[in-house]
């Protein structure tokens, strides 16, 4: 952790060549030194926050894939045959998955058990910085991928890619 005087010594340039600015650690700092120290600290803070968001997104993205795999396997245990699972990234912490099923299975009572399982699964997986939700959609004559992409579902899960 750097001290304010470390920031000032390493990050502040003299305001004017003709004037001797107070040196860090003396009785006071010039306005320009304070502004420069603020900017330097702010830039370091933004970089740290960006790195933390990127790390959290990467972890959540990985987890959403793993969790979707678990749901697909459970749906198959219920006797359902998902055709595709498409991901939409809403934010760094929120993900939505659209699972397509044959129309006959979408109307089958087995889907009720799947909805119960998925609801419990979503609640158990949710944390302060991770939210995954699932939707189901019937398909009759295949999936119009262009329409799904226009709705933001652009990433296919590998378990169901043919």
Model-derived regions: residue spans:
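Catalytic "initiation/cleavage/transfer" segments centered on a nucleophilic residue
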Residues: 5-37, 126-162
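Short edge beta-strands and adjacent turn/loop segments
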Residues: 75-96
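A short interface-forming secondary-structure element
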Residues: 95-113
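Helical scaffold of the NTase/Pol beta-like nucleotidyltransferase catalytic core
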Residues: 31-81
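Short, internal active-site loops enriched in acidic
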Residues: 90-93, 102-103, 138-144
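Amphipathic alpha-helical interaction surfaces
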Residues: 74-77, 81, 100-103, 120-124
């Amino acid at each position: 952790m750097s001290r304010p005087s470390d920031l000032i010594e390493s990050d502040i340039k003299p305001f004017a060549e003709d004037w001797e600015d107070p040196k860090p650690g003396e009785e006071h700092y010039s306005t320009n030194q304070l502004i420069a120290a603020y900017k330097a600290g702010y830039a370091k803070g933004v970089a740290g926050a960006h790195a933390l968001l990127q790390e959290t997104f990467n972890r959540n993205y990985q987890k959403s894939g793993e969790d979707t795999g678990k749901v697909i396997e459970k749906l198959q245990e219920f006797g359902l045959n998902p055709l595709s699972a498409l991901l939409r990234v809403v934010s760094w912490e929120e993900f939505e998955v659209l699972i397509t099923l044959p129309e006959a299975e979408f109307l089958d009572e087995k889907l009720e058990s799947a909805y119960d399982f998925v609801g419990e699964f979503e609640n158990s997986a949710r944390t302060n910085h991770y939210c995954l939700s699932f939707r189901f959609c019937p398909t009759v004559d295949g999936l119009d991928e262009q329409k799904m992409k226009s709705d933001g579902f652009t990433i296919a899960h590998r378990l169901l890619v043919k």
